[in-house]
Amino acid sequence: GIAAQIFREAGVGKVYEANKRGAVNLYSGVADLEGCSKITGDMILKPSGRFRRHKAIVKLFEIGRANQKLAKSGKIRIAAAIFDADGDRFFRLEYDPFQDTLWVLCGDEAAILQAQYLVSQKINSGALYINTVESDLNASTFAKSLGLRPLLTAVGDKWILLKIRLALLEQKLATGKLPKQKLTYLKNKIRSLKKNGVTSINTLLDLDASIPESTNITKNEVLAVGSEETGHNITTGYL
């Protein structure tokens, strides 16, 4: 699948695709992991272990136990990304060789790891860290300590995407050259959309068309991470 291909291209040492075939999200995917912070060895035992049929979890224990010495020495790390079938959300699993346990990192925890990495690349200073009202408040607090701007939104990745689009319009407006009266009008328009929401995509398209493109290249990204506790994760990409 596409996830395995991307991990290989990114330089991950060994990539195992646990359940490429089979029914969608059956004994796989994120839903099975919700509300579970750790998975112990007895939870994959037959005939009644909770995760005995979850192929990725069973495979991660198998690989972890086979490489326990190396993992304890710190020479390798053994982890998994559990995706839903449509690929829009994931949880990260980390094998703990000292306890023979899998730690489950939800969307908030995975997003913070991603935010730390992006901040280290020096192009995300002051960028947005967007999460929803169901997220852990500590995630926003920590994101702020990294130099990001936390922003809270309603539950649903569509609301995260809307916040991102409005932020991009604000950035475009800030770098464009417009008469003061029109600039004030457009700022107020964006402010209103932030408060009241958008009922038609045409509103955003018309607003975008009314702001001239600028030759100025901004140094920093508008967005670092947009995430939900449930594992939906959004960051900037370029085609």
Language-model features: locations:
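Phosphate-binding chemistry for phosphorylated carbohydrates and sugar-nucleotides
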Residues: G1-L239
